[in-house]
């Protein structure tokens, strides 16, 4: 997976994510929408109870891993199913393309989430930190991306 973005004054203005395994190119430009292989994409309108939750967790921080699984279990009780893929950029694109309804990870570097976060927003989704606060792209952050504000 390859992910790239362009920031202007702390705001992502262009985001691109390429999945070579499925030959999918996701991209978005602020104010212009989100696309996959040239087709416009949108988040799903499924409620969480009928939806899929995606999450990530770092294998390098066992305390963070424990908190991630506790949160995953809490979301699993509300959702239809849950998955962990290992790629923040692709998980964010899955939200944008309507393949899942919610994604979270407790600590990511900006290069892991910046491009995908714009793609989600331009597809109609919402991206914040885990506490619902705006993302600061200059530093590591938690991520909560969803198909709509809950």
Task: Give a label for each model feature.
Residues 1-3:
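Conserved small/polar residues in nucleotide/adenosyl-binding loops
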Residues 97-102, 125-126:
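Alpha-to-beta junction loops
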Residues 105, 130:
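Short beta-strand and adjacent tight-turn residues that come in two discontinuous sequence segments
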Residues 93-96, 114-122:
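Hydrophobic residues within well-ordered alpha-helices
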Residues 111:
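Acidic donor-binding loop at a coil-to-helix junction in glycosyltransferase catalytic cores
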Residues 122-125, 132:
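Short glycine/proline-rich, acidic loop/turn segments that cap or connect secondary-structure elements
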Residues 5-92, 133-135, 139-150:
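Acidic beta-strand-loop-alpha-helix segment within the catalytic core
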């Amino acid at each position: 997976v390859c992910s790239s973005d362009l920031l202007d004054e702390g705001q992502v203005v262009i985001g691109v994510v390429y999945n070579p395994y499925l030959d999918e190119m996701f991209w978005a430009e602020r104010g212009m929408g989100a696309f996959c292989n040239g087709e416009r994409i949108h988040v799903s309108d499924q409620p969480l109870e009928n939806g899929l939750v995606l999450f990530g967790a770092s294998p390098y921080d066992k305390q963070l891993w424990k908190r991630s699984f506790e949160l995953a279990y809490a979301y699993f009780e509300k959702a239809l199913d849950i998955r962990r893929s290992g790629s923040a950029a692709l998980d964010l694109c899955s939200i944008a393309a309507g393949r899942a309804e919610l994604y979270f990870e407790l600590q990511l570097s900006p290069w892991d989430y910046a491009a995908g976060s714009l793609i989600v927003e331009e597809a109609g989704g919402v991206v914040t930190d885990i506490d619902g606060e705006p993302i600061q792209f200059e530093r590591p952050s938690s991520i909560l991306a969803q198909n709509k504000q809950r």
